[in-house]
Amino acid sequence: MGLTVACLRIVVLVSTLALGAPSQAQSPPSTQASDPRAMGWMQGFPPPADKTIRFTDPDYFSFPKLRWTVCHFRELMPTAGVDRGPGAASALPQAPEPGIDALRFTPLGGQASMSWGEAFDANHTDGLLVLHHGRVVYERYAGCLGPHTLHGAMSLTKSITGLLGEVLVAEGALDENARVGTLIPQLQDSAFGDASVRQVLDMTTTLQFSEDYADPNAEVWQHAQAGSTLPPPAGYTGPRSYYESLQQIRKGGEHGQVFGYKTPNADALGWLLARTTGKPLNELLAERIWRRIGAEREAFYTVDAIGTPFAGGGFNVTLRDLARLGQLILQQGEWQGVQLLPSAAIERIQRGGERAPFARAGYAQLPGWSYRAMWWHSGDAHGAFSARGVHGQTLWIDPVADVVIARLASHPVAANAANDPTSLPAWRAVTKHLMAQDQTPLLGGQWVIEDVAGAGVIDRTRAFLRFLADGRLVGHATCNGLRGHHTSGARGRLRLRLTGITRKRCAPALMHQEERLLALLPRVTRYRIDDSGALWLYTAAGKTLTARR
């Protein structure tokens, strides 16, 4: 399958299409043959000369060396840690689902089916973990990766940067309508000077910046050398940091008209986050998320010569911790009963962006998709959205199925278009399977309330319920958040117990709706899910509540 220019843009700065990666006319070594251990990379004291990998090698990030490098960035370049704090790692309950490797699906554009296990190998997967209702139903490793190994996340990093950006917007610390040049005077004369924060977040800026890795004169090479992700050539006199590189990028047209996937947007956003909070990106992520979700290991960012974290592609993480991050987002920023991130930030990401600017960008394999806050939204019936990085890095979140899929990989080709045909249908196949096998249909996603005791609901009031696997009930009662517990049994029996609610006043009509809802919930005795997927809650007196995911 040929790569279009649009597809080539879906790459991280350390891509290798111009550095000796195999052409698509060639058949790269299989995942087994290219395993770092089978190849003998960096084995021995010292390793043989022809098995040594150095940062100064022009092909250190080319396949098949790539398969070793993705787990060893910390040995090759400067980094900054994302502190996990002193606490214990949070539990990931195990509930293995047999038969997932045998699931079959048809790749995009194909005719013959393939199995999930075959796709694992075809995509040169290093690790893949699936959470359903917060429980691990599938976990498998290969290549350089193990349960405690850190792996480069590539452009998946951008989505973490975007998440933190949306958090600051939701909290009022960062004005999404402000001009970047006003917030960062050093960027006033650059392409970003008159761009809004929102345009940077959604990558609807127009930059004179090429990420065509087949072009040796593309601006991406200088940006990579400025950020120290590639060794500069002899006599290099260009920018020496991300900050310097961003100031040299010029405007290519009117902002806000078309989606244009350009890594400098993420680096500009990283600068905005640091300027707003007074903290570098690695410290901000540690403070807001990493120390609070029970991460197993310190994560890290690669950094430039002055210590600036690479906001567009430098994050390194374990597979399990990546899955924990996905579960936090699936749970609307709530973790073990504590709201770590404003739910409004997650909801804005989950809604996706405008489809028209995305459609004009030419992603033929992603019809109906959109992009918001550096997250990719599928536009499908489940509202699935994802963080994506080249060589196969993925964090796929399906709110309806209550599924998180985390994958770290070292695919030979540095473009998502190369693995999407065997990845996107695989994600949908496993979510369909898990939903079909689900013995706890109440769990998963938000049940958005459509009617309370026959009185309907006021439009756009965001009343919803979430039934969590540990027995907790969380939701929004119209004006206020609620929490409690749920217990279900045979023949649709259900008991709900409320244990807390916030006490914010709002308009009388909204308060009246909330009062009706809060009066009904403790009286619920049973439930059913009808053929349309609607949830019905019943009281002994015959009153009902209906909701839909």
Question: What spans do the regions from the language model cover?
Answer:
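Active-site Gly/Thr loop motif
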Residues: 296-299, 350-404
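Short, charged, amphipathic alpha-helices and their helix-cap/turn boundaries
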Residues: 135-140, 181-182, 216-255, 280-298
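Lipid interaction determinants
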Residues: 439-549
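Active-site-proximal alpha-helical segments within enzyme catalytic domains
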Residues: 203, 264-272, 313-334, 393-409
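Active-site helix/loop module of the DD-peptidase/beta-lactamase fold
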Residues: 147, 170-212, 248-250, 264, ...
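N-terminal leader/targeting segments and the immediately adjacent pre-domain N-terminus
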Residues: 22-145, 202, 206, 247, ...
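Active-site SXXK
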Residues: 134, 152-177, 200, 269-273, ...
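Short active-site loop at a secondary-structure junction
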Residues: 118-129, 142-173, 177-191, 195, ...
